[in-house]
Amino acid sequence: MIQNVGNHLRRGLASVFSNRTSRKSALRAGNDSAMADGEGYRNPTEVQMSQLVLPCHTNQRGELSVGQLLKWIDTTACLSAERHAGCPCVTASMDDIYFEHTISVGQVVNIKAKVNRAFNSSMEVGIQVASEDLCSEKQWNVCKALATFVARREITKVKLKQITPRTEEEKMEHSVAAERRRMRLVYADTIKDLLANCAIQGDLESRDCSRMVPAEKTRVESVELVLPPHANHQGNTFGGQIMAWMENVATIAASRLCRAHPTLKAIEMFHFRGPSQVGDRLVLKAIVNNAFKHSMEVGVCVEAYRQEAETHRRHINSAFMTFVVLDADDQPQLLPWIRPQPGDGERRYREASARKKIRLDRKYIVSCKQTEVPLSVPWDPSNQVYLSYNNVSSLKMLVAKDNWVLSSEISQVRLYTLEDDKFLSFHMEMVVHVDAAQAFLLLSDLRQRPEWDKHYRSVELVQQVDEDDAIYHVTSPALGGHTKPQDFVILASRRKPCDNGDPYVIALRSVTLPTHRETPEYRRGETLCSGFCLWREGDQLTKCCWVRVSLTELVSASGFYSWGLESRSKGRRSDGWNGKLAGGHLSTLKAIPVAKINSRFGYLQDT
């Protein structure tokens, strides 16, 4: 039976590879038809704003002030949130923003915002900002942003209606929004842990003291009185207005270090800790925390008080902004060093160095395209949150794609394929007669895999990162004509459903650990993205979906694919495949309907 299934599937895969060109042509034609059918569709929460940049909107360089841009962004996003909620909304946070392009006088700013996903009373709004030159008709991407808004009603508690995504892009954003929300909820604790665990070497002793600027010289303090024009229809201060004031004092602090007009390149998350109303006095404080070779970090905090006689001030916001100084060719210039004050100044100095490392790790892991990220990424405490996020979001985004092609169907097990650039992805699904929570329990603990999957010889738990993330060392038998067995170092991230209709997720990807380097007795394998998604279909019914990504040339050369680990031996692009026949894996998956979770051992047991 297994051999017959394997033969059928191998023939199906051979058909997939031999007819790749015709499938791609048919897929393009289908996409063109779908686009034509959906030309009239527009997201009901989408809000657009277009503003002509006037001299009153610009800074000393004749470019649009980032503070003014932040106000426009916040207004557009708030209107989108209120369109969905049907009631007033307030800004809760704004994720990290990286500015790719500046905007000059006479150009147009086009801002588009739409709700990606709604939770109980909060929602994530995605914002895209582009600039347009009316004379040359050229357009540039300026930045992307993600904001969280909270719906507010005075009498009843808000329960937001759910978003129903329609397009592929909407499905991807909707799926990943839950993981981004997870990151935001633990953001403060994550930063504290990372800063506590990151050993940042001090280099103050090796720096040229003649070029040092005392940090105290960059300190700025400014007070603002919140007036009715600064507030929304609820009397709360506009989040965008507070962000604009913060950008203003940060720019002054940066200018005092470099004695030039700096350019803001990035903002770390704005998090509104409390509200501010008309009549409040806001005290904004800024100081340069650290100066690197071509950039500097400025820390800003905002405190509010109601009356001059009040002794207690409310901390309502903090942010860290990265500035550069550009020359005539728009290249960053060298900056003078900063000399921090003893005590808190030295603490801020080292924390800024840690945050820089975190930003680089985050940008490398999260922002890079799939083709730019190596199969294995080094794991350490400074990037664990972003590796887990990338692990889960990559799998969710792959599952959400709507251009999968049905390649084969055998005994109600469907195999889909998707070719994209140099990657060929597989998507296998079937309905199993087992509760989704039980299937999730079985599949999420890799230590139980050798009990029911013959391609897992041994699994060792290397590190329990947190409740839902763990790193395993996996070995598999020597297959495919190789004399050496393979081993893998795998980050496994599991997620329970965030809401009704969400899947259980088990995401796998390779990482590297200094404690588990390559050894002569094993061929080190790597996996880019693979895992399971499980949907509850009814009482004791679960739709089980397994997905993985492979390099196209390896699949074409070998004609095989593996169940849980798509491997490539390090340094050998034409080798390293396990050579596992699909029939064995299909029979393993089909065994789930006649299985149960053993409460004592936790593995799949035939009934």
Swiss-Prot record:
Top-level taxonomic group: Eukaryota
Entry's induction text: By cold exposure and repressed by heat exposure.
Residues in START domain copies: 375-585
Tissue/organ expression: Isoform 1 is predominantly expressed in skeletal muscle, liver, testis, stomach, spleen, lung and brain. Isoform 2 is predominantly expressed in kidney, uterus, hibernoma and white adipose tissue.
Keyword presence, Lipid metabolism: yes
Gene Ontology molecular functions: carboxylic ester hydrolase activity; fatty acyl-CoA hydrolase activity; lipid binding; long-chain fatty acyl-CoA hydrolase activity
Uppermost EC category: hydrolase
Gene Ontology, cellular component aspect: cytoplasm; cytosol; extracellular exosome; mitochondrial matrix
SMART domains: START
TM segment ranges: none
Subcellular localization(s) per the UniProt record: Mitochondrion matrix; Cytoplasm
Main location: mitochondrion
Keywords: Cytoplasm, Fatty acid metabolism, Hydrolase, Lipid metabolism, Mitochondrion, Phosphoprotein, Repeat, Serine esterase, Transit peptide
Residue stretches making up the HotDog ACOT-type domain: 43-155, 216-329
Pathway noted in the entry: Lipid metabolism; fatty acid metabolism
Keyword Flavoprotein: no
Enzyme Commission number, as recorded: 3.1.2.-, 3.1.2.2
Modified residues (Phosphoserine): S15, S25
Function: Has an acyl-CoA thioesterase activity with a preference for the long chain fatty acyl-CoA thioesters hexadecanoyl-CoA/palmitoyl-CoA and tetradecanoyl-CoA/myristoyl-CoA which are the main substrates in the mitochondrial beta-oxidation pathway.
PANTHER family in the record: ACYL COENZYME A THIOESTER HYDROLASE, ACYL-COENZYME A THIOESTERASE 11
Protein name: Acyl-coenzyme A thioesterase 11
